[in-house]
Amino acid sequence: MNEIELRLARLRELMKREHLSAFIFPSTDAHQSEYVADHWRGREWISGFNGSAGTAVVTMKSAALWTDSRYFLAAEEQLEGTEYQLMRLKMEGTPTIVEWLGKELQNVQSPEVGLDGIVNSYNYVKDLIYSLRKLGGITLRTNLDPLEQIWENRPSLPANPVEIQPLEYAGETLASKVARIRKSLRELHADGMLVSALDDIAWALNLRGTDVHCNPVFVSYLLIESDKVSLFVDDNKLSPEVKQYLQDNQVSLYNYNKVEKCLESYSEYNILLDGDETSYYLWKAVKCQEIVAAGSPIPAMKAVKNKAEIEGYRSAMLKDGVAMVKFLKWLKPAVEAGGQTEISIDEKLTSLRAEQKLFRDISFDTIAGYAQHGAIVHYEATPETDVVLKPEGLILIDSGAQYQDGTTDITRTIALGAVSEEMKHIYTLVLKAHIQLELVKFPDGASGTQLDAVGRECMWREGYNFLHGTGHGVGSYLCVHEGPHQIRMEWMPTPLRAGMTLTDEPGLYLAGKFGVRIENTVLISDYMSTEFGKFLQIEPLTLCPIDTTPIDVDMLLPEEIDWLNAYHHSVYEKLSPFLDEEEKIWLENATKPIK
C-alpha cells in the first residue's frame, strides 16, 4: 500500500464506524480561503493533490477529485498510482459531485454523506442538501471532522505574530474603514456583520500576519456591530503594541474559539452573513431574530485602491522590476553554462527579490515550467519533476512578491535559445492578446466579461483559446488573488472602476510541448469624460521587459508595435536609475524598439 491508500483505508474504517457512505473534502478552511494554513490542507493530505482548488470525494469503494483547467495536467500526474479518478470541471461528460454520488450510492441502503461544516460554506452546504434530497434518500451529516482522528501529527493552528500595516501604506485609518462598513450595513438594514474572510479582516483593521504561506493574513474572525468591534484571535499572536493599537481603536479582543458562543448570545436584532464566506457551522450557531443574507460590502471597498496604496504598488513594482532585470540578465548565460534547473532558477529569483527593501515573502509559489512543463498552467517543480534547463526552447516563469508597500504578480515567457516557428506563432498570439487588453478603453462600470473578449479575439480567430481567467484582482500587501472583480469568460457582474488593480495574463498551452503566458499587473484609471459618460483605461504597473526574440513581428499590428515600444521605453526610463552599468546595457538591449 502506498501512503494515500493507507490514508483512505483509515478514513473508510472511520466511515464504517460512523455509518457514512461518502465523505467530501474541500480545498478551503474555516474562512473559505483559497490558500490555507497547513492545518486545513486535508484535501491534499487525503488525495496527494496539492493544487489550490479542488474537491475530493471518497466512498467505501471509490474516490474522485474535481479540479479546474489550471490543474488538469498537474492533477493527472499527482493522482497517478492512486485510486482517484480525475474529474475535469466544466468539460463535456464530467459529472457533478452530486451526479457522481447518485450513481456511486444507488445500491446503498439509506446512504449518508459526510462533510465538515466548519470548512464548508453555508451556501455550498445548503445547495448540497437540496441537491442530495432531489436524488432521493441521501442525507447529509455536517458535524464530523475525520481528520482529527485519522491524520497523525496534523499541524496545529498557526500562531504567528500580527503586525500593524502603517498608515503610509494603508492610506486609510481603521476608524474610517469601520465607519464606511457601518454605513454600508445601515444601507443593507443590518445591525451587525460577521467577517470570516481573512484578507477582509486584515484590510479592515490595517493588520497583517504570516499564518498562511505567501498570504499576509492571520487566522481570526471579526464582528462589527453598530457600537462595537470584536476581534476573535489567539492572544499569543498579539504584541503589546498591537493590543494597544486595537484598544486605541475600540476593538475588543476575544479568543479565536469563542466566536461560536458570541454568535449564540448575539444581542442585536439581526446580523449580516455572507453565505459564500461564512461556514455552515457558524451560520447555524446564530440565534438572533433575523439573518440578513447578503454579500459582504468589504471586498468592493478593498478592490478600489486609495492614493497611498497605488503609490505603494508603483514603489513595489520598481523594486520587483529591478529584481527581475537582474534575474533575466543572469538567466541565459547561467543556462548556457549548464546545471540550472527549474528549482534552482526559482531560488535565484527569490534571493534577488529578498535583497529589495520592504520584501516580506513571495506572493505565491513560483511557476517555472520549462518546455512541456510550461503547458501545465499551475505547474510547481518538485525534486521528482525538476528538469535541467537547456539553451533552447521556452520557459514560462510566473512569480510574484509581497512587499510591505504592495503585492506583485508577473509572468514572462523566455526563449532560452533557438525556438521553432510554432513557438514564435503561439508566443506572438499571446502577446497580441496581452497588448489588446492593455489598449482597450471602456465605459466606467463595464464588466470583466466584456473586456475578456477583447483579449481573446485574436486567438479565437485562429481557433485557439485558454480556459483560465484573463485577469484577477491583486491585493495591496494582501492576497495575490483578490475579488470580486475579474476578467474572465464566465459572467462577472462586478463593475470595473478606476483604482482597481488586476492582472492581464492570457496564455496558450500545447500539452506535451510548451506553454506561453505573458502577465502584467495593471491599474484601471480614468481616461476621459464625454457627453456619453466616463471612460476608463488600463495602465501597466509591472515594469519588466517582454522577451522580443520569439516575436513574429509580421503578426503585430502597428498599434501593437507602438504599445510594446512605448512600454519598453517606460520600463527603461523607470528602472535604469537603479541599475549598475552592465545591467543598464542589458536592459537597453532588451527594451530596444522593434520595427
What are these regions (language model features)?
Residues M1-K595:
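Active-site neighborhoods and metal-handling regions in enzymes and metal-associated proteins
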